[in-house]
Curated annotation (Swiss-Prot):
Family assignment from sequence similarity: Belongs to the NusB family.
InterPro entries: NusB-like_sf (IPR035926), NusB_fam (IPR011605), NusB_RsmB_TIM44 (IPR006027)
Name recorded for this polypeptide: Transcription antitermination protein NusB
Entry keywords, A to Z: RNA-binding, Transcription, Transcription antitermination, Transcription regulation
Stored Pfam families: NusB
NCBIfam families for the chain: nusB (TIGR01951)
GO CC annotation, single: cytosol
A GO MF term: RNA binding
GO terms, biological process: DNA-templated transcription termination; transcription antitermination
Role this protein plays: Involved in transcription antitermination. Required for transcription of ribosomal RNA (rRNA) genes. Binds specifically to the boxA antiterminator sequence of the ribosomal RNA (rrn) operons.
UniProt lineage: Bacteria, Thermotogati, Thermotogota, Thermotogae, Thermotogales
């Protein structure tokens, strides 16, 4: 299940990445080409749930991320790091069944795979601060 959920997160990340270059396009439409590659219907539904949730909360996600960036602004981040942080922040704050450690590990892996050699550490540092400052207290007991 973990490997399959990783693929789901990866498809959401790819859609967010592409959307960052095509802001005038609908994120859900962009996501279709990435999410459709997932073999499991339940994972496709989950991916669309993430996409819709991120669309609805993008402004607050960006505000929260900006609050925890040190010596950076959101628009100065690489497209990769910015969208991994959006996905990770959404999962930390709005997805109840995923422990904080799992979210951090998954986002670090996406950073290592798609970002620079420092992306994993950078993403981990920012998301760790966001988790400590913003995540629901119940997530610390999972």
């Amino acid at each position: 299940m973990i490997k399959r959920r990783h693929k789901m997160r990866e498809s959401v990340f790819k859609a967010l990445f592409q959307w960052d270059f095509q802001k005038d396009e609908d994120l859900t439409e962009i996501a279709k080409q990435h999410v459709s590659l997932l073999e499991d219907e339940k994972l496709r539904e989950q991916a669309y749930s993430y996409i819709e949730g991120i669309k609805k909360t993008i402004e607050s996600l960006d505000e929260i991320i900006s609050k925890y960036l040190q010596n950076w602004t959101l628009d100065r981040l690489s497209v990769t790091d910015r969208n991994i942080l959006r996905l990770g922040t959404y999962e930390l704050l709005y997805v109840d069944d995923v422990p904080i450690e799992v979210t951090l590990d998954e986002m670090i892996e996406l950073g290592k795979t798609y970002g620079t050699e420092n992306s994993g550490k950078f993403v981990n540092g920012v998301l760790d601060r966001i988790a400590k400052g913003e995540a629901p207290k119940e997530k610390f007991d999972m």
